[in-house]
Protein backbone atom coordinates (compact mmCIF):
# COMPACT_ATOMS: atom_id res chain seq x y z
CA UNK A 1 0.00 0.00 0.00
CA UNK A 2 1.25 3.50 -0.78
CA UNK A 3 1.61 6.21 1.87
CA UNK A 4 1.29 9.60 0.16
CA UNK A 5 -0.07 11.31 3.27
CA UNK A 6 2.54 9.84 5.61
CA UNK A 7 5.67 10.41 3.52
CA UNK A 8 7.50 11.84 6.53
CA UNK A 9 6.75 8.67 8.53
CA UNK A 10 7.21 6.07 5.82
CA UNK A 11 9.04 3.52 7.96
CA UNK A 12 6.60 3.89 10.84
CA UNK A 13 3.69 3.35 8.44
CA UNK A 14 5.30 0.20 7.04
CA UNK A 15 5.68 -1.14 10.57
CA UNK A 16 2.06 -0.32 11.35
CA UNK A 17 0.92 -2.07 8.16
CA UNK A 18 2.83 -5.18 9.23
CA UNK A 19 0.90 -5.23 12.51
CA UNK A 20 -2.50 -4.72 10.90
CA UNK A 21 -1.86 -7.27 8.17
CA UNK A 22 -0.68 -9.83 10.73
CA UNK A 23 -3.73 -9.18 12.92
CA UNK A 24 -6.06 -9.76 9.96
CA UNK A 25 -4.35 -13.05 9.15
CA UNK A 26 -4.78 -14.25 12.73
CA UNK A 27 -8.46 -13.28 12.86
CA UNK A 28 -9.16 -14.95 9.51
CA UNK A 29 -7.42 -18.13 10.63
CA UNK A 30 -9.42 -18.24 13.86
CA UNK A 31 -12.69 -17.76 11.98
CA UNK A 32 -11.83 -20.48 9.48
CA UNK A 33 -11.06 -22.92 12.30
CA UNK A 34 -14.28 -22.07 14.15
CA UNK A 35 -16.34 -22.47 11.00
CA UNK A 36 -14.73 -25.82 10.13
CA UNK A 37 -15.23 -27.15 13.65
CA UNK A 38 -18.84 -26.02 13.68
CA UNK A 39 -19.43 -27.76 10.37
CA UNK A 40 -17.82 -30.97 11.64
CA UNK A 41 -19.64 -31.07 14.99
CA UNK A 42 -23.00 -29.57 14.07
CA UNK A 43 -23.13 -30.37 10.34
CA UNK A 44 -23.71 -26.71 9.67
CA UNK A 45 -21.42 -23.78 8.86
CA UNK A 46 -22.76 -20.43 10.09
CA UNK A 47 -20.35 -18.34 7.99
CA UNK A 48 -21.20 -17.81 4.33
CA UNK A 49 -18.02 -15.92 3.49
CA UNK A 50 -15.41 -13.55 4.93
CA UNK A 51 -13.73 -10.47 3.48
CA UNK A 52 -10.98 -8.33 4.97
CA UNK A 53 -9.26 -5.07 4.12
CA UNK A 54 -6.89 -2.39 5.36
CA UNK A 55 -8.08 1.21 5.08
CA UNK A 56 -6.36 3.36 2.48
CA UNK A 57 -4.12 6.18 3.75
CA UNK A 58 -6.51 8.71 2.22
CA UNK A 59 -9.48 7.24 4.09
CA UNK A 60 -7.51 7.17 7.34
CA UNK A 61 -6.46 10.80 6.89
CA UNK A 62 -10.06 11.82 6.21
CA UNK A 63 -11.22 10.14 9.41
CA UNK A 64 -8.56 11.85 11.52
CA UNK A 65 -9.41 15.26 10.06
CA UNK A 66 -13.10 14.73 10.82
CA UNK A 67 -12.11 14.15 14.45
CA UNK A 68 -9.71 17.11 14.48
CA UNK A 69 -6.69 14.89 15.05
CA UNK A 70 -3.20 15.52 13.74
CA UNK A 71 -2.12 13.20 10.96
CA UNK A 72 0.47 11.00 12.69
CA UNK A 73 1.06 7.26 12.93
CA UNK A 74 0.63 7.50 16.70
CA UNK A 75 -2.85 9.02 16.28
CA UNK A 76 -3.79 6.40 13.69
CA UNK A 77 -2.99 3.57 16.07
CA UNK A 78 -4.67 5.32 19.00
CA UNK A 79 -7.82 6.81 17.44
CA UNK A 80 -8.66 4.92 14.23
CA UNK A 81 -10.19 1.62 15.30
CA UNK A 82 -11.02 0.28 11.85
CA UNK A 83 -7.70 0.48 10.00
CA UNK A 84 -7.90 -3.31 9.78
CA UNK A 85 -11.37 -4.66 9.12
CA UNK A 86 -13.03 -8.06 8.75
CA UNK A 87 -16.57 -8.58 7.46
CA UNK A 88 -18.36 -11.84 8.21
CA UNK A 89 -21.48 -12.72 6.23
CA UNK A 90 -23.92 -15.18 7.84
CA UNK A 91 -27.13 -16.84 6.72
CA UNK A 92 -29.33 -15.95 9.69
CA UNK A 93 -29.39 -13.34 12.45
CA UNK A 94 -28.96 -16.09 15.05
CA UNK A 95 -25.63 -16.93 13.41
CA UNK A 96 -24.45 -13.36 13.98
CA UNK A 97 -24.72 -13.60 17.76
CA UNK A 98 -23.34 -17.14 17.76
CA UNK A 99 -20.22 -16.02 15.88
CA UNK A 100 -19.81 -12.92 18.06
CA UNK A 101 -19.96 -15.11 21.17
CA UNK A 102 -17.37 -17.53 19.79
CA UNK A 103 -15.02 -14.65 18.98
CA UNK A 104 -15.44 -13.13 22.44
CA UNK A 105 -14.58 -16.48 24.07
CA UNK A 106 -11.17 -16.67 22.37
CA UNK A 107 -8.63 -16.44 25.19
CA UNK A 108 -6.23 -14.15 23.33
CA UNK A 109 -8.84 -11.74 21.98
CA UNK A 110 -9.98 -8.70 23.96
CA UNK A 111 -13.34 -7.19 23.05
CA UNK A 112 -12.88 -3.43 23.38
CA UNK A 113 -16.22 -2.19 22.08
CA UNK A 114 -19.49 -3.54 20.68
CA UNK A 115 -22.14 -1.74 18.63
CA UNK A 116 -25.32 -3.68 17.93
CA UNK A 117 -26.96 -1.99 14.94
CA UNK A 118 -29.33 -4.94 14.59
CA UNK A 119 -31.14 -4.23 17.85
CA UNK A 120 -30.73 -0.48 17.29
CA UNK A 121 -30.35 0.26 13.54
CA UNK A 122 -28.81 3.52 12.39
CA UNK A 123 -31.12 6.34 11.37
CA UNK A 124 -30.67 5.50 7.68
CA UNK A 125 -31.67 1.87 8.31
CA UNK A 126 -28.19 0.33 8.45
CA UNK A 127 -28.05 -2.96 10.38
CA UNK A 128 -24.97 -4.92 11.39
CA UNK A 129 -23.08 -6.10 14.47
CA UNK A 130 -19.74 -4.36 15.07
CA UNK A 131 -16.94 -5.45 17.37
CA UNK A 132 -13.65 -3.68 18.02
CA UNK A 133 -11.19 -6.28 19.27
CA UNK A 134 -7.50 -6.36 20.14
CA UNK A 135 -5.38 -9.34 19.19
CA UNK A 136 -1.70 -9.88 20.08
CA UNK A 137 0.79 -9.83 17.21
CA UNK A 138 4.00 -11.61 18.20
CA UNK A 139 7.12 -9.98 16.76
CA UNK A 140 10.75 -10.99 17.25
CA UNK A 141 11.34 -8.60 20.13
CA UNK A 142 7.88 -7.77 21.49
CA UNK A 143 4.15 -8.44 21.44
CA UNK A 144 1.83 -5.71 20.17
CA UNK A 145 -1.91 -5.60 20.87
CA UNK A 146 -3.44 -4.62 17.52
CA UNK A 147 -7.00 -3.43 16.93
CA UNK A 148 -9.32 -4.95 14.33
CA UNK A 149 -12.91 -4.04 13.54
CA UNK A 150 -15.18 -7.03 12.92
CA UNK A 151 -18.53 -6.52 11.18
CA UNK A 152 -21.02 -9.39 11.23
CA UNK A 153 -24.19 -9.28 9.14
CA UNK A 154 -26.58 -11.44 7.15
CA UNK A 155 -26.60 -11.80 3.37
CA UNK A 156 -29.68 -9.56 3.20
CA UNK A 157 -28.09 -6.87 5.40
CA UNK A 158 -24.97 -6.95 3.25
CA UNK A 159 -27.01 -6.56 0.06
CA UNK A 160 -28.75 -3.47 1.45
CA UNK A 161 -25.52 -1.93 2.76
CA UNK A 162 -23.69 -2.47 -0.54
CA UNK A 163 -26.45 -0.96 -2.66
CA UNK A 164 -27.01 1.91 -0.23
CA UNK A 165 -23.31 2.75 -0.43
CA UNK A 166 -23.38 2.78 -4.24
CA UNK A 167 -26.47 5.00 -4.33
CA UNK A 168 -25.03 7.49 -1.85
CA UNK A 169 -21.74 7.52 -3.75
CA UNK A 170 -23.58 8.64 -6.89
CA UNK A 171 -25.09 11.53 -4.93
CA UNK A 172 -21.75 12.26 -3.21
CA UNK A 173 -23.35 11.50 0.15
CA UNK A 174 -26.25 13.93 -0.33
CA UNK A 175 -29.12 11.83 -1.61
CA UNK A 176 -32.56 13.48 -2.01
CA UNK A 177 -35.03 13.04 0.82
CA UNK A 178 -37.32 10.69 -1.12
CA UNK A 179 -34.34 8.45 -1.95
CA UNK A 180 -33.35 8.28 1.73
CA UNK A 181 -36.93 7.43 2.63
CA UNK A 182 -37.06 4.63 0.05
CA UNK A 183 -33.77 3.22 1.32
CA UNK A 184 -35.09 3.25 4.88
CA UNK A 185 -38.19 1.36 3.76
CA UNK A 186 -35.98 -1.17 1.98
CA UNK A 187 -34.03 -1.71 5.20
CA UNK A 188 -37.29 -2.51 6.99
CA UNK A 189 -38.13 -5.04 4.29
CA UNK A 190 -34.69 -6.60 4.77
CA UNK A 191 -35.26 -6.85 8.53
CA UNK A 192 -38.62 -8.55 7.92
CA UNK A 193 -37.02 -10.94 5.41
CA UNK A 194 -34.28 -11.89 7.88
CA UNK A 195 -36.85 -12.54 10.60
CA UNK A 196 -39.03 -14.58 8.26
CA UNK A 197 -36.12 -16.70 7.04
CA UNK A 198 -34.97 -17.27 10.62
CA UNK A 199 -38.46 -18.46 11.60
CA UNK A 200 -38.58 -20.81 8.62
CA UNK A 201 -35.16 -22.19 9.46
CA UNK A 202 -36.17 -22.85 13.06
CA UNK A 203 -39.32 -24.64 11.88
CA UNK A 204 -37.37 -26.78 9.42
CA UNK A 205 -34.92 -27.81 12.14
CA UNK A 206 -37.83 -29.13 14.20
CA UNK A 207 -38.53 -31.73 11.58
CA UNK A 208 -36.47 -34.87 11.99
CA UNK A 209 -35.56 -37.03 9.02
CA UNK A 210 -38.22 -39.52 10.08
CA UNK A 211 -40.97 -36.93 10.17
CA UNK A 212 -39.92 -35.63 6.75
CA UNK A 213 -40.10 -39.13 5.30
CA UNK A 214 -43.47 -39.64 6.92
CA UNK A 215 -44.70 -36.37 5.43
CA UNK A 216 -43.46 -37.33 1.97
CA UNK A 217 -45.14 -40.74 2.21
CA UNK A 218 -48.48 -39.05 2.80
CA UNK A 219 -48.40 -37.15 -0.51
CA UNK A 220 -51.15 -38.66 -2.74
CA UNK A 221 -50.08 -40.11 -6.08
CA UNK A 222 -52.58 -37.81 -7.77
CA UNK A 223 -50.53 -34.83 -6.63
CA UNK A 224 -47.52 -36.12 -8.54
CA UNK A 225 -49.30 -35.83 -11.87
CA UNK A 226 -50.31 -32.26 -11.02
CA UNK A 227 -46.70 -31.38 -10.33
CA UNK A 228 -45.65 -33.16 -13.50
CA UNK A 229 -47.99 -31.04 -15.60
CA UNK A 230 -46.55 -27.91 -14.01
CA UNK A 231 -42.99 -28.97 -14.79
CA UNK A 232 -43.82 -29.79 -18.40
CA UNK A 233 -41.02 -32.23 -19.24
CA UNK A 234 -40.34 -35.75 -18.02
CA UNK A 235 -38.10 -38.72 -18.71
CA UNK A 236 -39.56 -41.91 -20.22
CA UNK A 237 -38.77 -45.20 -18.52
CA UNK A 238 -37.40 -46.58 -21.77
CA UNK A 239 -35.42 -43.43 -22.61
CA UNK A 240 -32.28 -45.53 -23.13
CA UNK A 241 -33.65 -46.58 -26.54
CA UNK A 242 -34.44 -43.02 -27.61
CA UNK A 243 -32.23 -40.40 -29.15
CA UNK A 244 -31.88 -37.20 -27.09
CA UNK A 245 -33.87 -35.16 -29.61
CA UNK A 246 -36.76 -37.64 -29.41
CA UNK A 247 -37.35 -37.21 -25.67
CA UNK A 248 -41.15 -36.71 -25.38
CA UNK A 249 -42.94 -33.81 -23.77
CA UNK A 250 -44.99 -34.94 -20.81
CA UNK A 251 -48.70 -35.34 -21.49
CA UNK A 252 -51.10 -36.72 -18.88
CA UNK A 253 -53.56 -37.98 -21.51
CA UNK A 254 -50.77 -39.85 -23.29
CA UNK A 255 -49.69 -41.29 -19.94
CA UNK A 256 -53.15 -42.60 -19.22
CA UNK A 257 -53.37 -44.36 -22.62
CA UNK A 258 -49.92 -45.93 -22.66
CA UNK A 259 -49.71 -46.76 -18.98
CA UNK A 260 -45.99 -46.02 -19.04
CA UNK A 261 -44.30 -44.93 -15.85
CA UNK A 262 -42.29 -41.73 -15.76
CA UNK A 263 -39.60 -40.44 -13.43
CA UNK A 264 -40.43 -37.27 -11.48
CA UNK A 265 -38.01 -35.88 -8.90
CA UNK A 266 -36.60 -39.39 -8.36
CA UNK A 267 -40.12 -40.91 -7.96
CA UNK A 268 -42.05 -43.05 -10.41
CA UNK A 269 -45.40 -41.47 -11.28
Predicted regions and their residues:
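An acidic, glycine-/histidine-flanked metal-binding catalytic module
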Residues: 1-24, 28-37, 149-269
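Surface-exposed, low-hydrophobicity interaction/linker segments
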Residues: 23-24, 28, 32-68
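Short secondary-structure junctions
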Residues: 37-38, 69, 107-112
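Short, flexible, solvent-exposed loop/turn segments with mixed acidic/basic and small polar residues
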Residues: 39, 72-80
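Short Gly/Ser/Thr- and Asp/Glu-enriched loop/turn motifs at secondary-structure junctions
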Residues: 45, 81-83
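Glycine-rich, low-complexity intrinsically disordered segments
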Residues: 47-50, 76, 89
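Long beta-strand-rich cores associated with HINT superfamily self-processing modules
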Residues: 77, 90-199
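Terminal, regulation- and interaction-focused segments at domain boundaries
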Residues: 83-90
Amino acid sequence: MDFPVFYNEAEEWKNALLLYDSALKQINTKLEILNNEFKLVHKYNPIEHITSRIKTPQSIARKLRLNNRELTIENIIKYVNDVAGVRIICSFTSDIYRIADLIAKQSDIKVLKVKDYIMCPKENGYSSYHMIVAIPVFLTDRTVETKVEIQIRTIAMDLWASLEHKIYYKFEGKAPEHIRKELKECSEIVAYLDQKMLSLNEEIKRYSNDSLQEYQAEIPDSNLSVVAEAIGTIIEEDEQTQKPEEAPVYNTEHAAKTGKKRMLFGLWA
